[in-house]
């Protein structure tokens, strides 16, 4: 291919080019075994252009027992990871060390988050950059581990969920502290909790997942409800700026609040009392079912546990069996979701002829 010839043309007599000449025959063979060899070769070329003049990079690939072959497998099978590797030569070195590919523990992630919180108490840009870079870094690590066969799918899903949990908890902590100071208050006028929903609540986060959440608050003792509500809304604004606002060039961490009470028509955050009233009086059957994956993820744990125990559990684990009307609603929702996911051609094929 033209990309391969270009690689050969750039080879000179330097140490780096000599190493590259040794590697390239095997590299081309390994890239050819991937799902998209052309993409793999293009990614290899980009890496060479960025790091190839550094003989240590190529020397590492030559001397490692597994790194070069793993790298080729990644480059020819994952556009996401190929692009990510082009930004960090450190990530390439992980491919030669199984221990470096293992997902970090939640405790280790929390230590890094606390360090960033202490360094960036007032600077939203620096804090947002550190959190988003951390997410990119750790998701990249886990993705490389999965494609290298170091971690299975279950461990990867758990590891990625831990990354999201740690970062969202730190971002919420930062937003609460920031708004408490901005409003000239000594203490937060409300406790705030985030409840994971959907795939995020079910600990099935992947590379491109949004974090589905419900946010709620509870006024502190003796605090005016209006003050607590104003504070909570400003905290949500700050949280969204940290995770997905235009504050940094690092990729956004998308949060999705559409599963909240009243959906897109409802407030982004509402009080515990308001949530309780809504779910007991107005929620549809599908909203009860959506609570099956609800779990506490960030913020005030006591508030989160109260929501799960007092509001979610009676609805998602009802004592009485579902009524015919409720079962009918669930079947309709299931049929609609399946229709939305199926290609149009398959829907037409499955429809009976008239």
What are these regions (language model features)?
Residues 353:
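Ser/Thr-centric signal marking residues that sit
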């Amino acid at each position: 291919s033209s990309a391969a010839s270009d690689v050969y043309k750039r080879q000179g007599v330097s140490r780096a080019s000599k190493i590259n000449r040794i590697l390239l025959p095997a590299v081309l063979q390994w890239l050819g075994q991937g799902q998209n060899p052309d993409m793999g070769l293009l990614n290899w070329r980009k890496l060479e252009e960025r790091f190839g003049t550094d003989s240590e990079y190529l020397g590492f690939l030559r001397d490692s027992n597994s790194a070069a072959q793993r790298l080729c497998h990644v480059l020819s099978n994952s556009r996401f990871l190929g692009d990510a590797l082009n930004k960090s030569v450190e990530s390439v070195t992980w491919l030669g060390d199984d221990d470096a590919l293992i997902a970090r523990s939640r405790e280790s992630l929390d230590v890094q988050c606390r360090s960033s919180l202490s360094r960036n108490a007032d600077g939203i840009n620096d804090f947002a950059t550190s959190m988003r870079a951390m997410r990119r870094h750790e998701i990249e690590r886990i993705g490389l581990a999965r494609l290298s066969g170091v971690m299975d799918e279950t461990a990867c899903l758990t590891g990625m969920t831990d990354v999201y949990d740690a970062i969202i908890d730190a971002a919420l902590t930062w937003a609460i502290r920031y708004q408490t100071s901005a409003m000239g208050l000594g203490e937060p006028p409300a406790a705030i909790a985030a409840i994971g929903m959907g795939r995020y609540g079910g600990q099935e986060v992947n590379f491109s997942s949004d974090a589905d959440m419900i946010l709620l608050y509870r006024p502190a003792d003796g605090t005016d409800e209006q003050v607590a509500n104003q504070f909570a809304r400003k905290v949500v604004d700050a949280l969204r700026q940290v995770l997905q606002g235009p504050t940094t060039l690092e990729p956004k961490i998308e949060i999705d609040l559409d599963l909240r009470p009243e959906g897109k028509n409802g407030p982004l955050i509402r009080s515990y009392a308001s949530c309780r009233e809504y779910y007991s009086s107005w929620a549809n059957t599908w909203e009860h079912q959506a609570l099956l994956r609800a779990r506490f993820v960030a913020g005030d744990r006591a508030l989160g546990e109260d929501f799960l125990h007092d509001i979610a559990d009676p609805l998602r684990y009802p004592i009485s069996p579902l009524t015919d009307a409720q079962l009918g609603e669930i079947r309709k929702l299931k049929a609609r979701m399946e229709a939305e996911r199926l290609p149009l051609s398959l829907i037409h094929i499955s429809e009976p002829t008239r």
